Amino acid sequence: MSTLVQCGYFERGQCQSCRHIKLPMAQQLAAKNLELQQLLAPFVDKTEPQFLPPVVGDSSGFRNKAKMVALGAAHAPVLGIVSPSGEAVSLCDCLLYPTDMQALLHRLERFVQQAGIPPYRVDKAKGELKFILLTRSQVRGEYMLRFVLRSRDAIARIERELPTLMAEYPQIKVVSVNLQPVHMAILEGEEEIFLTENTRLEERFNDVPLFIRPKSFFQTNPQVAAKLYQTAREWVADFAPASLWDLFCGVGGFGLHCAAKDIPLTGIEIEAEAIACAKMSAQLMGLDKVEFMALDSTDFAKGEAAQTKPELIIVNPPRRGIGESLCHSLSEFAPKAILYSSCNPKTLAKDLGHIRGYRLTKVQLFDLFPHSDHFEVLALLVKD
């Protein structure tokens, strides 16, 4: 584990996103682990060791997604952030990104200049380019590039320059324009216009093929995420469940790692694009007892109250947690075990207070977000 990452942006006071970057990784990890243990102490099963050693990855070059604010002017664009002092700062050399991603981000600044696309000015409500979103697949080093625009006015300019860019960077496989016409701090709008025939990026974690589309959620630290999915697979296998639910399933990462040809799996996710990706993965894996549906997970669970109940349920909610209603539904279903993957230990602790009849037998921290306060937690609840 490396000790310190030397970041010029942080040293100059231009970017404070990695607020703990001056601390050695071991110290960062110890603080996160202590917070986790204090939050979950009221729920742990005192009869067996629950807190497993934290799982870590690289401290730099690990991030697969860049969200760049478009700043500056058409003749001198800047992709990055507004610093605390109000200046436009290019973050193309951010050390969280792999070196090939840094190089492409620099090229995209030149692309915006060559295309003559004016960055959107929030103070004047004028301009076209709001964000550039870049996602990298670790398995092949391929990219999905998205331009978030105020209107369609700049699309022709993007299309004019795109062949040159893709000739230089053939690893760019998906390019799209997202229209976000609202004068609000919203990352993306409803309409997505593809400028390439390909509409998805292929990824692979362990032996599981996964797909990324523009609006589908995907873990930003693939190195540690692969370990997270593999751990979930191993914990679930100990129960040999006859049936599985994967709620808030996203593109299917957890469920597909835990599935088998003879085990029925139901995956539920509100985002239709993610469900389309999960279905493609299941087909590639030859899983014919898998059903993925674009539904609200809480509503689905309520509707299934009188139906056949799964032997094990996986939940991977957003930061808000699963909520009291779904906690009660899970308690009523009474599966053998509940596997809870959380990106917010505070809401995890709150949810654990509403799940009845279970003991917390395993907890493990996965440091997907070095230098920040955030981390992922995998928690195993077993029926009393």
UniProtKB/Swiss-Prot annotation:
GO BP of this protein: rRNA base methylation
Biological source species: Shewanella sp. (strain ANA-3)
Known EC number: 2.1.1.189
Catalytic residues, chain numbering: C343
Residue positions binding [4Fe-4S] cluster: C7, C15, C18, C94
GO molecular function, one term: 4 iron, 4 sulfur cluster binding
Superkingdom per UniProt: Bacteria
Function comment: Catalyzes the formation of 5-methyl-uridine at position 747 (m5U747) in 23S rRNA.
Protein name: 23S rRNA (uracil(747)-C(5))-methyltransferase RlmC
UniProt keyword list: 4Fe-4S, Iron, Iron-sulfur, Metal-binding, Methyltransferase, rRNA processing, S-adenosyl-L-methionine, Transferase
Reactions mediated catalytically: uridine(747) in 23S rRNA + S-adenosyl-L-methionine = 5-methyluridine(747) in 23S rRNA + S-adenosyl-L-homocysteine + H(+)
Gene giving rise to this polypeptide: rlmC
Binding site for S-adenosyl-L-methionine: Q219, F248, E269, N316
Class of enzymatic activity (EC top level): transferase
Family stated for the protein in its record: Belongs to the class I-like SAM-binding methyltransferase superfamily. RNA M5U methyltransferase family. RlmC subfamily.
Lineage: Bacteria, Pseudomonadati, Pseudomonadota, Gammaproteobacteria, Alteromonadales
